[in-house]
Each structure stands twice: as C-alpha cells, then as structure tokens.
UniProtKB/Swiss-Prot annotation:
Provenance organism: Saccharomyces cerevisiae (strain ATCC 204508 / S288c)
Domain of life the protein comes from: Eukaryota
Region (Disordered): 78-100
Other noteworthy facts: Partially overlaps CDC9.
Protein name: Putative uncharacterized protein YDL163W
Lineage: Eukaryota, Fungi, Dikarya, Ascomycota, Saccharomycotina
Compositional bias ranges of the Basic and acidic residues kind: 84-93
Length: 100
C-alpha cells in the first residue's frame, strides 16, 4: 500500500510541475521537495532524494516536449537555442553568428 501511495504522490507532483511550469522558481522548488515521498517510504531511505530528482528531471523533459515555445522560431527549437521557458537564448548562438 505504501508503494501505491508513493506512486500517487509522484504522479500528483509531476502534474503539479506541469501546472506550475510558468510559475516562480519558489513554487517549483516547493514542488521539487521529497517530503511527500519520505512520508510514504519512511525516514532513512537513502535513495529517495535521488529518485525524486530523476522523476523531476523526467517531468521537465516531458514538459519541454509538450509545451509550446513562447518566443523563437522552429530553427531555435530544433537547434536547442531555447532557455527553460522556451525563449530564444541569444547567448547560445553559433560562433559564425557572433560579431567581432
């Protein structure tokens, strides 16, 4: 039963991550805490934090795949020139585009 409850908790946190995608970093840091998993799996489980960070990273990748970019064009998206919010990041332009 504890494992099922933890699964529900992880699912809820992943859903909340999707909802709070464009929220403040404080909201995301609250959602990324592993308190919820610790409540179900108990204290002293050494890999809970690492497991939760992996789940959070997978959710982040899923979010980037499904949410539309706010700015930028298709070339920026395909070349990885977008920041976390989907905006074009001028700092990551190819060297040939930089002016000397």
């Amino acid at each position: 039963m504890e494992l099922g409850a933890a699964t529900v908790c992880v699912t809820a946190v992943c859903f909340n991550f999707l909802v709070a995608y464009s929220s403040s970093p404080l909201t995301l840091s609250i959602l990324s805490s592993s308190i919820c998993l610790d409540d179900f799996l108990g204290e002293g489980v050494p890999s809970v934090g690492l497991f939760f960070m992996e789940v959070k990273n997978l959710a982040k990748v899923a979010c980037l795949g499904f949410l539309p970019a706010e700015e930028g064009n298709e070339d920026d998206i395909n070349n990885g020139n977008l920041d976390f919010k989907g905006r074009a990041d001028e700092r990551r332009q190819p060297v040939s585009n930089l002016r000397m």
